[in-house]
Each structure stands twice: as structure tokens, then as C-alpha cells.
């Protein structure tokens, strides 16, 4: 796997990403789930996407509520991630139920978020494959 160019990596969402993936996000939630011997084995070790992602998105909002974002740019990064997810919902519906073309989905994304075109194209092509 190639190492990304650090000068082109967006670090504005770093704190939201940490809250989402680590503590109190996925890592914390999965650790508690797997340690809970009162749960049946199938509930301890299976991944429930809606629950897991819902929890992780909720933990991002805790960053603001608990004063964990160190500066306004990190909070902006969290809001940018929320916007990206909303755009994903529109694009997914457009592609899979409204008959959007690849180009329509790319143009919608470009018009509504500040991401590099190559990132948008890669995302759209991933949605098309799913």
C-alpha cells in the first residue's frame, strides 16, 4: 500500500476521526461488547453496522458537547464529515433508484462539498460498485 503524501492529507477532521474510531467510538464500543459475558456469544462478536456506525457518529457530536475539539477548525472538520455523509445519501439514492449517471453523481458532489475531484470520483465509483 502506498504511503499517502502527508502534505496533501486533510488533518482538519483528525479529532472527529479519533472520536469516531477510537474512544469513545468503535474501539471503546467493541471492547465493551466483547468483554460483556452476559451477552450471548453471537451478540458479543458480530458486527451490527447500523448500531456500530450510529454509535460512532454520535460520539463525534460528543466532541462539541464535552468541549473536546481543540479549535474551531477541528469542529469544522466534524461538520464537513456530516455534510459528506448527507451527500453520500443523496448520491446513493440518485445512482441506485433515480437513474443518475456517474457524471451526474460526480457533479452533484462537486457542487456540494469541497473535496478534490479525484476523491469524489473514487467515492462515486465505489458507490456504483456496491
Task: Please annotate each region the language model reported.
Residues 1-130:
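Long, His/Glu/Asp-enriched segments that create or flank divalent metal/ion-associated functional microenvironments
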Amino acid at each position: 500500500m502506498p504511503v499517502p503524501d502527508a502534505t496533501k492529507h486533510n488533518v482538519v477532521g483528525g479529532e472527529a476521526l479519533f472520536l469516531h474510531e477510537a474512544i469513545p467510538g468503535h474501539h471503546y464500543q467493541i471492547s465493551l461488547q466483547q468483554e460483556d459475558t452476559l451477552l450471548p456469544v453471537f451478540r458479543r462478536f458480530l458486527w451490527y453496522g447500523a448500531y456500530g456506525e450510529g454509535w460512532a457518529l454520535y460520539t463525534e457530536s460528543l466532541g462539541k458537547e464535552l468541549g473536546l475539539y481543540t479549535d474551531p477548525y477541528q469542529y469544522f472538520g466534524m461538520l464537513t464529515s456530516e455534510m459528506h455523509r448527507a451527500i453520500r445519501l443523496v448520491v446513493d439514492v440518485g445512482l441506485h433508484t433515480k437513474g443518475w449517471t456517474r457524471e451526474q453523481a460526480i457533479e452533484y458532489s462537486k457542487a456540494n462539498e469541497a473535496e478534490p475531484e479525484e476523491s469524489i470520483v473514487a467515492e462515486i465509483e465505489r458507490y456504483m460498485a456496491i
